[in-house]
């Protein structure tokens, strides 16, 4: 069932996928992968508060789950709770210093808080680990343009 739900998400059939995740969680209420994927699906539908609840639920079961922490940070960022998002990314980075997604996402949140020079450092750091990380490159280019325009 998890594979079917994932495939539906790939096809952007999020509402249908939710039903599969709900069925999975009825059977295996502590399936962390299903909980996180359910949260991501809710997030894709713009149901951020519910997504946040799912990530918190996953973290209650497995407190150091990097996927749940990064996704929680992403939702908090979307909700403009940048400091809280950064806290999530900091936990990830305390567990995995080379996590390029957490580094780049932290840069995005730092940038939204107005510290563009610091954001640039995070994007460069992510690119030093993975020089093909598109999000970091696009974010770096955008941040540099912002710096030039001010």
Give the label of every model feature segment.
Residues 1-33, 37-44:
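Alpha-helical segment of the N-proximal tetratricopeptide repeat
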Residues 9, 36, 43, 70, ...:
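Position-specific recognition of the canonical hydrophobic site in helix A of tetratricopeptide repeat
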Residues 32-33, 66-67, 100-101, 134-135:
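Helix-start (N-cap) detector for alpha-helical repeat units in TPR-like alpha-solenoids
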